């Protein structure tokens, strides 16, 4: 059956001489793979809309079952987010997002995730000055999607909601109040505490408007990357690059 949808290209690879298989995250079906016949031909009208990170309209022949591959009929490019490809750091930030979404099961639909992914890539492309913050916020937001949200607003040792948080533990992946503080905890300032509270309690856009220093973002980067690696079991190539590029040393 024919369907029209919007989607962001997460991945693509050549399939036979002139064909590709792409994976997109769409507004209707979540993550879905499409076989794109003839798109590697010079005269193909579909070749620009299926490049990595492209946000496009897709007309498809939907597979009858979840095990089958849907087929691309026609595509129309909406935004290529081309500036991302000109800067290594921006490319890493965007690839962290898409590599996380690629870990989802096919046909797992979440319209809020679709909106946040589209917004995040748009901001990384158009507002490089906040791209680092966008990437880290998305990583925390994605933890909510997969059921691994971290609540850093209460002490992870005594569960007190009264004792003020003063530090975070990179060993236990939790916050610590002044009565439970250990030597392996890192003391945090009020700005970082407020930002953490916003991540837990507010939506993505509200958290994006919270002020945070680059140094505090570096702390959160180290924390969330370690959490993904040790507790979630996800650590992609782009996440490794995020941990090693000079900005985060």
Curated annotation (Swiss-Prot):
Listed Pfam families: RecO_C (PF02565), RecO_N (PF11967)
Gene Ontology CC entries for this record: bacterial nucleoid
Keywords: DNA damage, DNA recombination, DNA repair
Intrachain S-S bonds: none
Superkingdom, taxonomy of origin: Bacteria
Keyword DNA repair part of the UniProt annotation: yes
Gene Ontology BP terms: DNA recombination; double-strand break repair
Biological role: Involved in DNA repair and RecF pathway recombination.
Annotated PANTHER family: DNA REPAIR PROTEIN RECO (PTHR33991:SF1)
Family, similarity comment: Belongs to the RecO family.
The name this protein goes by in its record: DNA repair protein RecO
Source organism: Mycoplasma capricolum subsp. capricolum (strain California kid / ATCC 27343 / NCTC 10154)
Lineage of the species this protein comes from: Bacteria, Bacillati, Mycoplasmatota, Mollicutes, Mycoplasmataceae
Recorded name of the encoding gene: recO
